[in-house]
Amino acid sequence: MSESKTPKDVIKIVKERNVSFIQFWFTDVLGILKSFSITPSELEEALSEGMGFDGSSVEGFARIEESDMIAKPDPATFQFLPWRPKDRPVARMFCDILEPDGTPYVGDPRYVFKRILAKVAEQGYTYYLGPELEYFYFENNETPKIIDKGGYFDAPPLDTAGHLRRDTIFALQEMGIQVEYSHHEVAPSQHEIDLRYDEGLRMADTALTMRITVKEIARQNGVYATFMPKPLFGENGSGMHTHQSLFKGDANAFYDASDQYHLSAMAKSYIAGIMAHAREMALVTNQWVNSYKRLVPGYEAPVYVAWARRNRSTMVRVPMYKPGKEKATRIEFRSPDPACNPYLAFAVMLAAGMKGVEENYQLPEPIEEDIYEMDEIARERAGITSLPGSLYEALQEMEKSELMRETLGDHIFNKLIANKKIEWDRYRTHVSEFEISNYLPIL
């Protein structure tokens, strides 16, 4: 990542580069990006005091009678937007949302993540993340019409969108975001860009930045990019496999050279925590009705709560690309999808893992056989449970979770559940094309 900037640095750069507008970015509870722009004349005051706005119109924020909010920009996140004109550049900063008295707003997803990160930092740990965001390119946002027929790792002529990935990576690099690699994914018109691991809060900001960058570069090229988890029937959906580790100083707290899996006792309890709380945090990591169309057997998406080293049918995997190398030791949580709110999703992952560490959860034996090939009896014998099969089931699990309420705080916990109940009711009562085509001719 690029070097962090102070308010003084930002003011100087804006003046020297003749910046025309500075966008202030934050998200609602669902992770939908919100933005407003200020002119350079307002910048100094905005950096010191923040900018007021009406929070009652933002999903999951305040009620109308308590709507005054302050967006306080984080100068460390200042970057130019590469898709804007170079002669009158536009920059952006992520914001923390504050109450009028300057205290953090409990409904701010970024604050939720910062709070759990601070708790972990007090114990001497730094949380690192490396998400793999998959997505699709379509001709437009009205119908999922593919633009290529490539498959996994295909090159041209089957992969005809390499230029889109390339231009996206160039834009990300201009913003100081490091990319490890990119490639065509399994489904037609599906792609992946893997971000180089980074500290937790920066990575949450980066994940949101990447989503916007992918969409902007696609728009400039006359196509549409979507992070919808399952836009095509009969094809793989898009996941956000999230690699994560905890470091204490320069030492990887997940690494133990003497262990047969090269995992420390802490790492094992962390994995056990992720597994124990996977069902109750699914509403956050997989928050849409459509998310559960991806989490079905047969499409390489994890359905079952288990862990392994090389087995990709499990929910948690310990990558073995560089076995025995301390810095590379990490876990990969495979069930989240890229349409989540990164702040909340990363927060609940960390909270679940640390709950396992704090209470010394015991990790079961790894499952190294293909779980999809096991029958129900075999899975029961192995102690393998499954993730929720629908948004409704995920709602039921989260509603009774003390850990999720504690991690998210009462405000976001209640707002998210209320929003998702409405979504489920709308879906449940909707008469779909499936019903019309299958039932109308015969009933």
Regions found by a protein language model. Give the residues of each.
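Glycine-rich, acidic/polar active-site loops that bind/position phosphate-bearing ligands
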Residues: 2-443
